[in-house]
Amino acid sequence: MPCSEVHFLKAEIYARGLAGITANLATAKTEYEAGITGSLNFWTQAAINSPVWVVDKPAGLPSGVAINAVLNNPIVMLDPTDATHATQQIYAQEWIDMIRQPWDAWTLLKRTGGLTPMDPDNAAGYVSTYGNFNRYQYPGSEKTFNLVNWSASTGGTNLVSDKIWIAK
């Protein structure tokens, strides 16, 4: 788990007041900004290390000025007055950070009840397209080679709309 994800999870805990922690948006903001900074550094380092990236390849990690420009962008700045909006902002940045971890991003979508970014002009289309996904389908080989357990687990269907056992 990258440091950015740890910071985003801590930001959520402080924003929502989870696990016996008193809600504190100031501390949530500190963790949120540390998560964004960690994400920017991680993905920039990935670009630097990439043998494929040759055009406009970053020469180094983002400067403090560049990071502050991102953190001070009105769209990115954590809302210090509204815990619900702040939590959605945390989820959005965590989702962006998970760009190369689609399974984790999908889990975040499910864990947050669909509060990850979506096109606001097509929210209904997003929900009708992706909102019924509860799990990945088992590969056909699972049914072929493990029919008894597959049947017990799925009830004989292999639909993405079927809930996983922990969500039933």
Predicted stretch roles:
Residues 1-168:
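Acidic/polar-rich alpha-helix caps and helix-coil junctions
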